[in-house]
Design a protein with these regions (language model features):
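Outer-membrane beta-barrel porins/channels
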Residues: 1-190
Length: 190
């Protein structure tokens, strides 16, 4: 708490990356003279989930205005993923790193309420805005995948009944733009 009307909250988060303890199987089926011939290559512990780091900061003014910013980093560039490679002795199926990029996510949001303790219901409506920018972790033909942009707006309408005055009906609308890095790819809007 900074003073009577202002407070700041700092948050940190960590997600432990780990192997999934499963098998990755590659099935190769070919047709030779009307007969299907198959081969299977297996790899134990071929998949991993990334370490995740996050930091967030929220400023609260008099319980009427909240502004928050978050940053999240997922270390996808360090995870192992099964890859089929051709060598002089045939095919090999191994877990390799560097097939993905690190994902960064930047978020910003705000909420405003005229009077959170007001007698009139319309004074307790919560107005919200938010924006998110995300870099991709996927790669397409060696290039970074599509970047993601999102914006949203919403309201929280208080519902008052004889049992509780804490119920809120949340309504929101959002827009998302997916922008590929490869020229000629389709851009998507939701």
């Amino acid at each position: 708490r900074i003073d009577k009307k202002n407070s700041i909250i700092l948050g940190l988060v960590y997600g432990l990356g780990h192997k999934t303890q499963g098998y990755a199987n590659y099935y190769d089926q070919q047709r030779q003279n009307k007969v299907y011939v198959g081969d299977t290559l297996s790899l134990r512990n071929g998949f991993e989930l990334p370490h995740t780091f996050g930091v967030g900061l929220t400023w609260n003014y008099n319980n009427r205005l909240r502004v928050a910013a978050d940053y999240t980093l997922q270390k996808w560039s360090k995870v192992q993923y099964p890859t089929l490679s051709r060598s002089t002795s045939g095919y090999t199926y191994t877990a390799e790193t560097g097939l993905f990029s690190d994902l960064s996510k930047y978020s910003l949001g705000a909420e405003y309420v005229v009077n959170p303790d007001g007698y009139r219901w319309y004074n307790r409506i919560r107005y919200r805005l938010g924006a998110v920018y995300t870099t991709p972790y996927t790669k397409v033909n060696g290039s970074d995948g599509p970047r993601n942009y999102q914006v949203s707006a919403g309201v929280g309408i208080p519902i008052i009944n004889s049992h509780s005055n804490r119920c809120v009906l949340n309504l929101a609308a959002g827009f998302e733009h997916v922008a590929p890095q490869i020229r000629g790819s389709l851009k998507e809007n939701y």
